[in-house]
From Swiss-Prot:
Family statement drawn from the similarity comment of this UniProt entry: In the N-terminal section; belongs to the sugar phosphate cyclases superfamily. Dehydroquinate synthase family.
GO biological process: amino acid biosynthetic process; aromatic amino acid family biosynthetic process; chorismate biosynthetic process
Name the UniProt record assigns to this protein: Pentafunctional AROM polypeptide
Species, as recorded: Saccharomyces cerevisiae (strain ATCC 204508 / S288c)
EC number of the protein: 4.2.3.4, 2.5.1.19, 2.7.1.71, 4.2.1.10
Length: 1588
C-alpha cells in the first residue's frame, strides 16, 4: 500500500494524497474545519458510487454534537456549471439557515469543484471549502490553486474568483469508478506537468504506459446496491490496485508541480501560465470539437502542436517532440485532429484554420491582439519563465498540413550554414534488427526518430526481441538484446504504416519468431499504399526455405501471415534482387540464426542498389558476423551460423539521402552548406550526390572522410548534367530533378537536358516517383521525358520562367503523394519561383500539400528550412475544401440484369441533370461496334472482364467528379479489380447505387429475353454468388419492383427521383420548425396496406416504419417495405426505427449483428430519419453517426417502466449524450404516473432548446404532453390495427385538444370574386379541416369589388384567416397587399391573401404551384434539365405556366398563341432568364433542335382550336418522342374534364395528359398549407372536389 503524502501550497500542507483514506478525510475536515453545518455537494453520478455512500454514512456517524450534515446533489455535466445552478444552491443554503461558519465539501470532478468553490467564495461573502476531487483531471489540475468559476452562454469560466480551499483531499480510490475515457483524458494534464517541469517523472511515465493502458482498458461495468437508496446501479470499475504505485506517483508528482508553480505565482501573472502548455492551441480545438472531444484530448493535440512550434523555432530537438508524441499515443491520447479514431469520435467535424486562430485570440495569456504560447525547451523545462509571443504566420504553418513556400529572396549570397540531418533510416532500421538479435546492451545514438523507426521499435518490443529503454533525455536508445531467444508471436497484427524498410526486414525476422501456447503466427500489415508495394520476391525465397507465409489480401503485398511453427532452414537461398536491395539485407541479417549456414545467391540479373547490401555486410561485421562474398559465383554470399555480439555503443550516421536537400539548397541559392557527419567514408551510396551530381553542375565541393560542404555558383548559373547513372543513390534522383529544372547552358541544341538513369526501382517506392516528378515538374512549367529506367529533365532557360502551379481556377497545390522525398524536393524548387523578381514585386507563394509526410525520415525538415536556412513559410486552409464544393460526384449504377438499370439510369441522369453513359455501349464503341455477346464468344468471359474493368477505371478516373451516371453490366462485380475500383470510388464520396428487385420476378423475365448473352450457369446461382459483392461494393441501394401499369411506373419514377435527390444532397431533408407530427406504422407487412398508407399519413410530416414489427429482417424484405411505402405515400420522409425490447419494442436486445445490418440497409436506402437508441453500445452509435450521410439522426430514449421523473438526472445525462453524439433531433418518451409529470416535462422542454426536442409522456395521463409537443409528435391513425405506444393520439385528436386549450384559433376563410357559385374551394378546404380536426371554416364571399373585400374581410373580420382570390379581383386586390411574393410579382396577379397579423397582408399566387405539382405528381421530374417546355395560349394563366416551367428547370420555353401579336409584350414583361421564345410561324418550329417534353395548355377549353394554332401545336407534340421522360401535357381548364387539346395530345401523339382538376386541387392544397401550416390531405380533397 502507499503512504499518505502531504504537499505544501502557498506555505500550508493542505494537499493530502493517499489511497482509501476515507477515515482520514472525515477526521481532517471535522478536526480542522469545525462548523455547525457541513454541506456535501456532488452530482447524481457520484451518488451511485459505493465509496461515496460509505463516506456520507461515516461523515454522519462522526459528526460532533451540535453539527449537522446536508447533502446537495446537482445534475451531471458542464451544463450544471451555470448561474442558475449557483443560484439554486445559494437559495437552498439560505433556506436551510446556513451561516458564515458553513463548510462546503465539493466531492466530484472539475465541474463540481469549480462551481462549489465559486459558491463558497461568494456565499455570506466567503465560507470555507474543502475540495475532494474524484476525477484524475480534477486531482491534478482543477482542485489545486483556488481557481473557481461558472460558465456563461458567451464562454467557459468567464465569471469566477480565486478562492483557496482549506484542504484538497486526494483519494486515489475514487479513480476505480472513473470511466476509461475520462481516465485517459486526465493523463494529458499529468503528462503536461511532467513535460514542463519534471524530466524524471516523464521518463517514469514512459516506462509505465503499457501497464496503465492494460489496466484502464480492462475496466468492467458492475452492478452495485446503493447503500442510501437500496436501488441497483451500474458503474464502471477499474482495478486500480494493479497499478496503484504508478497511479499514486503520477498523481502525487503532478500535484507537486502544480503546487510549486501556484505557490510562486498564485494570481497567474507569469510563471503560472507555464501550466498552460498545450492549452493555447488545445483550447482552440476544444472550442470547435466540444462536446465530442474532451479537454485532455484537445490539450494532448495542443501539446504536440506547441512542441512542433518550438522545434520550428529551432529550440526543441526533434527527439523531444518524438518522445512527447510517443508518450501521448502510449497513454491512448490523440496527437493530431486527423487521426482516424479521433475523427470518428468527433464526427468528422472540420477545424478551419481561421476559426482556430480566432479562438486562440481569446486567451488570458495574450496581450491585446498579440498571441502568447508556452514554448518547450526540452522535456522537463520551458523556454523562459512565461509564455512567448507568436505570430499568426508561424501558427498557421503549425496548424495545417498545407505549406506556402515564399520565394527565397532575402537569403544572403554569403550565407554559410551547418546542417545535421537526422540519422539514416537505412542504418537505424538495420541497427535495431541487429541489436535486437544480438546479445548484450547496445547504446544507439543519433537514431532517426520517425514513423519508420517508431514502427520498428514497436515491433521489436511487441515480439519481445529485446528490452528497450532511453537515456540522455531520450536522445539515446538502449537496446538490451537477448540473442533472438525470446522472440515470441504476438496476437495483434504489427501495423507498419507505409514503412517499406521495416516491413521487409521484419518479414525475415518473423521467420525466427517462436510460437507461444496461444499464438502460432504473426500478421504484418500497413496502410493502403503499403498494401500495394511489392514483397513477393522475399516471400518466395522464404517460402522456398521452409517458412510458411500467406497473403491476406493482394497477392505479392502486405498484409501477410507468417506461421511461427515453421522453421528457417538455411542452406542455399535464391533471391530475385532487381527490385529492392532491402530483400537481400533482410535475409542477410537473419541468416546467422538459420538452422544451417546460408548461401545467398542473387538471381535474375544485376541486383539493384548493391551499395546498400555492402552497408548491411559492414554493419553485420560491427556486430560480430563476417559475411564472405563468393569468388566463383556472381552476387553470392556465404553467411556462417552464429549470433551477434552487441557493441556497447553504435552511432548512426546521418541520412545521406536527407543530406541531399540542404546541399541542393546551397547549390540552387548560391550559398554554402556543410553536413559535418557524412563524407567519402560513408556506408551510404547517396553520400556521392555532392561529388557525382552537384559538382559537375557547377558547385564547389569540399569533402573529407566525415564531412561534405557544397557552395553553389551564382543563382541561375547551374549547368545541366548530360548523363548520370544514379543506381548507387536512387533515392537522391528526386533532388537531382529539381536542381536540373533550373539548370541551363549556352548550347542551343542541348535543350538544357539532364539525363538520369539507373533508377527503375523508384517506380515502386512510396509512390511511382518517376511519374510523380514528371507530373509535378510540369506544374512549374518544366518539361520531362520518362525513360525505361530513368528520366530526362529539360531545364528552363531562366529561373524567371518558373511558374506558380495553377490551373484555370487559380493556384493549385504541389501533390506529394504521401512521399517524404517528393515533398522535400519540391520545397526547394518552390522557393526558387519568383525568387529573381524585383524586391517590391508581390510574389505568390507555392503551395505544397501533405507536408507532414516528411515525418517518415526528417520530421524537422521544414523547421530547418525555415529557422536554419532562412526560408519564409506560412500555412493555409486546404484547397480541397473549395474545389470539392464544385465537384459533382458521379453515380455508378450496379445490379443484376433486368434490375431496371437502363431505365433508372435515364431517370437518374434526368433528375440530377447529369450526362448518361452506358458502359456496355461504350465497350461496343471501343470494339468496332462488336456486341458484348460476340466479343464473349470470340474472346471468352475473362478477356471481357479485363476490358470491362479497364473501361470502368478509365471513366471513373476521368469523369468521376464531373456529373455522370454510369450504367454498368450486371457482371462488373465478378472482377476483383472492378470491385476494388467500385469500393474506392464509394469511399472517395462517389455514389455506387445497387439497384435490385425480387429475384423470382427477375428470373421469369430473363428466361424470356433472347437479346442478352447466354449464362453459363443458372440465374439464381449467379445471384447467390453476386449478391454479397453488390452489397459490399455499393454505398447506396434502391429496390425497384416490377411495374404492371403506367401509374405504377410513374409513381416509381417519382419515388426514385426524390430518393436520388436526397442521397446526393440536392433535396435537403428539413427538420420541421413548427408544429408537426409523424405517424407510427405497426404493420408486419405493408404489401397489403398500400391503399391505406396515404390516408394514414394525412397531416404528417413523416412516417415511422417500426422495423421491429416487420415479419422478417432480411435486407430484401426491409428494402421492399421501404420501396412500397415511398411509392404509396409519394415519398413522405421515412423515420426508420428498430425499437429494442428494453426500450419498449420487439427487437431482441443483444442482436447487435442484425441491428448493424438493418442500420446499413436504412442508410443505403437513404431514409430521411433514423431513430438511434441512446442505450445502444457506443461503437454502434458512432458507426451510424459517422456513416449517416444526409440522413438525420433522432437520438431516442424511452422510459416504459416510469422509473425516472423528468427532474431525474437520467434525462439530463441522456440529453448531454445526445449532444455529444451530435444527433439532429432528440426524442424522449417518459411515462406519466400523475398529471404533475406533464408539468415537469414542460419545464424540461423549456430548459432544453439547443436541439429540436420531441418529448412526450405515455399513458392517457400523458395525453396533454403530446398536444403540447411541438416538433414531430408521434401519432397514430384510426386505420392502424393498434397504436405504437400507450396514449398515442391521432392528428385530429391533437388538433381538437389544442384548439380547446386556445392553441389554435378558429379562423374564417373565403373564396372572393364573381361568379363563384360553382367554386369548389369551400369543399376543398372544409374537407381538409374536417380530416385534420382543424376548427376553421371556409365560405364564399361573392363580390366584384376589391374595396368591399378590404372593408368587410381584411379590416372588418377579426377572425379572418385568408382568402382565395378569383376573377375579377386577382389584379384589383394587389393594391391592398403590404407584401407580395416573388411569384405574385412575376405572374402579376394574386390568388391567395395571407394575413401577417397587425392588419398586414401578403399577396401570393399558388397557380404556378398547382401546375408544377400536378406535373411532378404525374411523372415529370422535379428538374427537367435539357428538355424544353411549351405553353399554349397567352392569357393570364400562361404567366403562371411560364413561371412553373422555369421552376422545373426548362432551359427554353416556347409559347404559341392564336393571336401572335400578344406574345411579344407578354415575353418582354417576364424575366429574361426564363428564356421564352414566341413562335410566330409554323416553319420556324422545324428548325427547333430541342426535345419538348412538358406542356401547359392555357387556351379556352370550350371552343375548338384555331387551325393555325393546332398546326403549331402538332409540330411541337411530335418533339415529345425523344424526351428523357414520358412527355406530359397539363390542361389548365378544369371544365370540361376532357378538352380538345387533351384528346389530340393523348390519342394522336401518345402524350400523358393531366386534367385541370389536378391543377385546381394542387393549387388549393398549396393555399391550405400556407394558411394552416399543415399539408393538405390531397387524395381525400381531390375525391371530394371531383366526385360530382
Amino acid at each position: 500500500m502507499v503512504q499518505l503524502a502531504k504537499v505544501p501550497i502557498l506555505g500550508n500542507d493542505i494537499i493530502h494524497v493517499g489511497y482509501n483514506i476515507h477515515d482520514h478525510l472525515v477526521e481532517t475536515i471535522i478536526k480542522h474545519c469545525p462548523s455547525s453545518t457541513y454541506v456535501i455537494c456532488n452530482d447524481t453520478n457520484l451518488s451511485k458510487v459505493p465509496y461515496y455512500q460509505q463516506l456520507v454514512l461515516e461523515f454522519k456517524a462522526s459528526l460532533p454534537e451540535g453539527s449537522r450534515l446536508l447533502t446537495y446533489v446537482v445534475k451531471p455535466g458542464e451544463t450544471s456549471k451555470s448561474r442558475e445552478t449557483k443560484a439554486q444552491l445559494e437559495d437552498y443554503l439560505l433556506v436551510e439557515g446556513c451561516t458564515r461558519d458553513t463548510v462546503m465539501v465539493a466531492i466530484g470532478g472539475g465541474v463540481i469543484g469549480d462551481m462549489i468553490g465559486f459558491v463558497a467564495s461568494t456565499f455570506m461573502r466567503g465560507v470555507r471549502v474543502v475540495q475532494v476531487p474524484t476525477s484524475l483531471l480534477a486531482m491534478v489540475d482543477s482542485s489545486i490553486g483556488g481557481k473557481t468559476a461558472i460558465d456563461t452562454p458567451l464562454g467557459k469560466n468567464f465569471i469566477g474568483a480565486f478562492w483557496q480551499p482549506k484542504f484538497v483531499l486526494v483519494d486515489i480510490k475514487w479513480l476505480e469508478t472513473l470511466a476509461k475515457r475520462e481516465f485517459i483524458n486526465g493523463m494529458a494534464e499529468v503528462i503536461k506537468t511532467a513535460c514542463i517541469w519534471n524530466a524524471d517523472e516523464f521518463t517514469r511515465l514512459e516506462s509505465n504506459a503499457s501497464l496503465f493502458l492494460n489496466v484502464v482498458n480492462g475496466a468492467k461495468n458492475v452492478k452495485v446496491t446503493n447503500q442510501l437508496t437500496n436501488e441497483i446501479d451500474e458503474i464502471s470499475n477499474t482495478d486500480i490496485e494493479a497499478m496503484l504505485d504508478h497511479t499514486y506517483k503520477l498523481v502525487l508528482e503532478s500535484i507537486k508541480v502544480k503546487a510549486e508553480v501556484v505557490s510562486s505565482d498564485e494570481r497567474e501573472s507569469s510563471l503560472r501560465n507555464l501550466l498552460n502548455f498545450g492549452h493555447s492551441i488545445g483550447h482552440a480545438y476544444e472550442a470547435i470539437l466540444t462536446p465530442q472531444a474532451l479537454h485532455g484530448e484537445c490539450v494532448s493535440i495542443g501539446m504536440v502542436k506547441e512542441a512542433e512550434l518550438s522545434r520550428y523555432f529551432g529550440i526543441l530537438s526533434p527527439t523531444q517532440v518524438a518522445r512527447l508524441s510517443k508518450i501521448l499515443v502510449a497513454y491512448g491520447l490523440p496527437v493530431s485532429p486527423d487521426e482516424k479514431w479521433f475523427k470518428e469520435l468527433t464526427l468528422h467535424k472540420k477545424t478551419p484554420l481561421d476559426i482556430l486562430l480566432k479562438k486562440m485570440s481569446i486567451d488570458k495569456k495574450n496581450e491585446g491582439s498579440k498571441k502568447k504560447v508556452v514554448i518547450l525547451e526540452s522535456i522537463g523545462k520551458c523556454y523562459g519563465d512565461s509564455a512567448q509571443f507568436v505570430s499568426d504566420e508561424d501558427l498557421r504553418f503549425i496548424l495545417t498540413d498545407e505549406t506556402l513556400v515564399y520565394p527565397f529572396k532575402d537569403i544572403p549570397a554569403d550565407q554559410q550554414k551547418v546542417v545535421i540531418p537526422p540519422g539514416s533510416k537505412s542504418i537505424s532500421n538495420r541497427a535495431l534488427i541487429l541489436a535486437a538479435l544480438g546479445e548484450g546492451q547496445c547504446k544507439i545514438k543519433n537514431l532517426l526518430h520517425s514513423d519508420d523507426t517508431k514502427h520498428m521499435l514497436t515491433a521489436v518490443h511487441e515480439l519481445k526481441g529485446a528490452t528497450i529503454s532511453w537515456e540522455d533525455n531520450g536522445e539515446t536508445v538502449v537496446v538490451e538484446g537477448h540473442g533472438g531467444s525470446t522472440l515470441s508471436a504476438c496476437a495483434d497484427p504489427l501495423y507498419l504504416g507505409n514503412a517499406g524498410t521495416a516491413s521487409r526486414f521484419l518479414t525475415s525476422l518473423a521467420a525466427l519468431v517462436n510460437s507461444t501456447s496461444s499464438q502460432k503466427y504473426i500478421v504484418l500489415t500497413g496502410n493502403a499504399r503499403m498494401q500495394q508495394r511489392p514483397i513477393a520476391p522475399l516471400v518466395d525465397s522464404l517460402r522456398a526455405n521452409g517458412t510458411k507465409i500467406e497473403y491476406l489480401n493482394n497477392e505479392g503485398s502486405l498484409p501477410i501471415k507468417v506461421y511461427t511453427d515453421s522453421v528457417f532452414k538455411g542452406g542455399r537461398i535464391e533471391l530475385a534482387a532487381t527490385v529492392s536491395s532491402q530483400y537481400v539485407s533482410s535475409i542477410l541479417m537473419c541468416a546467422p540464426y538459420a538452422e544451417e549456414p546460408v548461401t545467398l545467391a542473387l538471381v535474375g540479373g544485376k541486383p539493384i542498389s548493391k551499395l546498400y547490401v555492402d552497408m548491411t555486410i559492414k554493419m553485420m561485421e560491427k556486430f560480430g558476423i563476417n559475411v564472405e562474398t563468393s569468388t566463383t559465383e556472381p552476387y553470392t554470399y556465404y553467411i556462417p551460423k552464429g549470433h551477434y555480439i552487441n557493441p556497447s555503443e553504435y552511432v548512426i550516421e546521418s541520412d545521406a539521402s536527407s543530406a541531399t536537400y540542404p546541399l541542393a539548397f546551397a547549390a540552387m541559392t548560391g550559398t554554402t552548406v556543410t553536413v559535418p557527419n557524412i563524407g567519402f567514408e560513408s556506408l551510404q551510396g547517396d553520400a556521392r550526390f555532392a561529388r557525382d551530381v552537384l559538382k559537375p553542375m557547377g558547385c564547389k565541393i569540399t569533402q573529407t572522410a566525415t564531412s561534405t560542404t557544397v557552395s553553389g555558383p551564382p543563382v541561375g548559373t547551374l549547368k545541366p548534367l548530360k548523363h548520370v547513372d544514379m543506381e548507387p543513390m536512387t533515392d537522391a534522383f528526386l533532388t537531382a530533378c529539381v536542381v536540373a529544372a533550373i539548370s541551363h547552358d549556352s548550347d542551343p541544341n542541348s535543350a538544357n537536358t539532364t539525363t538520369i538513369e539507373g533508377i527503375a526501382n523508384q517506380r515502386v517506392k512510396e509512390c511511382n516517383r518517376i511519374l510523380a516528378m514528371a507530373t509535378e515538374l510540369a506544374k512549374f512549367g518544366v518539361k520531362t521525358t520518362e525513360l525505361p529506367d530513368g528520366i530526362q529533365v529539360h531545364g528552363l532557360n531562366s529561373i524567371k520562367d518558373l511558374k506558380v502551379p495553377s490551373d484555370s481556377s487559380g493556384p493549385v497545390g504541389v501533390c506529394t503523394y504521401d512521399d517524404h522525398r517528393v515533398a522535400m524536393s519540391f520545397s526547394l524548387l518552390a522557393g526558387m519561383v519568383n525568387s529573381q523578381n524585383e524586391r517590391d514585386e508581390v510574389a505568390n507563394p507555392v503551395r505544397i500539400l501533405e507536408r507532414h509526410c516528411t515525418g517518415k525520415t526528417w520530421p524537422g525538415w521544414w523547421d530547418v528550412l525555415h529557422s536554419e536556412l532562412g526560408a519564409k513559410l506560412d500555412g493555409a486552409e486546404p484547397l480541397e475544401c473549395t474545389s470539392k464544393k464544385n465537384s459533382k460526384k458521379s453515380v455508378v449504377i450496379i445490379g443484376m440484369r433486368a434490375a431496371g438499370k437502363t431505365t433508372i439510369s435515364k431517370w437518374c441522369a434526368s433528375a440530377l441533370g447529369y450526362k448518361l453513359v452506358d458502359l456496355d455501349e461504350l465497350f461496343e464503341q471501343q470494339h468496332n461496334n462488336q456486341s458484348v455477346k460476340q466479343f464473349v464468344v470470340e474472346n471468352g468471359w475473362e478477356k471481357f472482364r479485363e476490358e470491362e474493368t479497364r473501361i470502368f477505371k478509365e471513366v471513373i478516373q476521368n469523369y468521376g467528379d464531373d456529373g455522370y451516371v454510369f450504367s454498368t453490366g450486371g457482371g462488373i462485380v465478378e472482377s476483383a479489380e472492378s470491385r476494388k475500383a467500385l469500393k474506392d470510388f464509394a469511399s472517395s464520396g462517389g455514389y455506387v447505387l445497387h439497384l435490385h428487385r425480387d429475384i423470382e420476378e427477375t428470373i421469369v423475365f430473363l428466361q424470356s429475353d433472347p437479346s442478352r448473352p447466354a449464362y453459363v450457369e443458372e440465374i439464381r446461382e449467379v445471384w447467390n454468388r453476386r449478391e454479397g459483392w453488390y452489397k459490399e461494393c455499393s454505398n447506396f441501394s434502391f429496390f425497384a419492383p416490377h411495374c404492371s401499369a403506367e401509374a405504377e411506373f410513374q409513381a416509381l419514377r417519382r419515388s426514385f427521383s426524390k430518393y436520388i435527390a436526397t442521397i446526393t444532397g440536392v433535396r435537403e431533408i428539413e427538420i420541421p420548425s413548427g408544429r408537426s407530427a409523424f405517424v407510427c406504422l405497426t404493420f408486419d407487412d405493408l404489401t397489403e396496406q398500400t391503399e391505406n398508407l396515404t390516408p394514414i399519413c394525412y397531416g404528417c410530416e413523416a412516417v415511422e416504419v417500426r422495423v421491429d414489427h416487420l415479419a422478417n429482417y432480411s435486407a430484401d424484405f426491409v428494402s421492399k417495405q421501404l420501396s412500397i411505402l415511398r411509392k404509396a405515400t409519394d415519398s413522405i420522409p421515412i423515420i426508420f426505427t428498430v425499437r429494442t425490447m428494453k426500450q419498449g419494442g420487439n427487437f431482441p436486445d443483444e442482436e447487435f449483428k442484425t441491428l448493424r445490418e438493418l442500420y446499413d440497409i436504412a442508410l443505403k436506402n437513404g431514409v430521411e430519419f433514423l431513430d438511434l437508441e441512446l442505450t445502444l453500445p457506443t461503437d454502434i452509435q458512432y458507426e451510424v453517426i459517422n456513416k449517416r450521410g444526409n440522413t438525420k439522426i433522432i437520438g431516442s430514449h424511452h422510459d416504459f417502466q416510469g422509473l425516472y421523473s423528468w427532474d431525474d438526472a437520467e434525462w439530463e445525462n441522456r440529453f448531454n449524450q445526445a449532444l455529444t453524439l451530435d444527433v439532429d433531433v432528440v426524442k424522449f418518451v417518459g411515462t406519466a404516473v400523475n398529471f404533475e409529470d406533464n408539468l415537469r416535462l414542460e419545464h424540461f422542454r423549456d430548459t432544453h432548446k439547443n436541439k429540436p426536442l420531441i418529448a412526450v409522456n405515455m399513458t392517457s395521463k400523458g395525453s396533454i404532453s403530446r398536444v403540447l409537443n411541438n416538433v414531430l409528435t408521434p401519432v397514430t391513425s384510426d386505420l392502424l390495427p393498434n397504436s405504437a405506444a400507450p396514449g398515442q393520439l391521432t392528428v385530429a385528436q391533437i388538433n381538437k385538444m389544442y384548439t380547446s386549450m386556445g392553441g389554435i384559433e378558429p379562423k374564417e376563410l373565403f373564396v372572393v370574386g364573381k361568379p363563384i357559385g360553382h367554386s369548389r374551394s369551400p369543399i376543398l378546404h372544409n374537407t381538409g379541416y374536417e380530416i385534420l380536426g382543424l376548427p376553421h371554416k371556409f365560405d364564399k364571399f361573392e363580390t366584384e369589388s376589391a374595396q368591399l373585400v378590404k372593408e368587410k374581410l381584411l379590416d372588418g373580420n377579426k377572425n379572418f384567416g385568408g382568402a382565395a382570390v378569383t376573377i375579377p379581383l386577382k389584379l384589383d386586390i394587389m393594391q391592398y397587399m403590404d407584401e407580395l411574393t416573388d411569384a405574385a410579382k412575376v405572374i402579376g396577379a394574386v390568388n391567395t391573401v395571407i394575413p401577417l397579423g397587425n392588419k398586414k397582408f401578403k399577396g401570393d399566387n399558388t397557380d404556378w404551384l398547382g401546375i408544377r405539382n400536378a406535373l411532378i405528381n404525374n411523372g415529370v421530374p422535379e428538374y427537367v434539365g435539357h428538355t424544353a417546355g411549351l405553353v399554349i395560349g397567352a392569357g393570364g394563366t400562361s404567366r403562371a405556366a411560364l413561371y412553373a416551367l422555369h421552376s422545373l428547370g426548362c432551359k427554353k420555353i416556347f409559347i404559341i398563341n392564336r393571336t401572335t401579336s400578344k406574345l411579344k409584350p407578354l415575353i418582354e414583361s417576364l424575366p429574361s432568364e426564363f428564356n421564352i421564345i414566341g413562335i410566330e410561324s409554323t416553319k420556324s418550329i422545324e428548325e427547333i433542335k430541342e426535345h419538348v417534353g412538358v406542356a401547359v395548355s392555357c387556351v379556352p377549353a370550350d371552343k375548338p382550336l384555331d387551325d393555325e394554332l393546332l398546326s403549331k401545336l402538332e409540330r411541337f407534340l411530335v418533339k415529345g418522342a425523344h424526351a428523357a421522360f414520358v412527355p406530359t401535357l397539363l390542361e389548365a381548364a378544369y371544365k370540361p374534364s376532357v378538352t380538345p387539346v387533351m384528346t389530340i395530345s393523348q390519342d394522336k401523339y401518345q402524350w400523358h395528359v393531366v386534367p385541370g382538376s389536378q391543377m385546381l386541387v394542387h393549387q388549393g392544397v398549396a393555399q391550405f398549407e400556407k394558411w394552416t401550416g399543415f399539408k393538405g390531405p390531397f387524395k381525400a380533397i381531390f375525391d371530394a372536389v371531383t366526385k360530382e
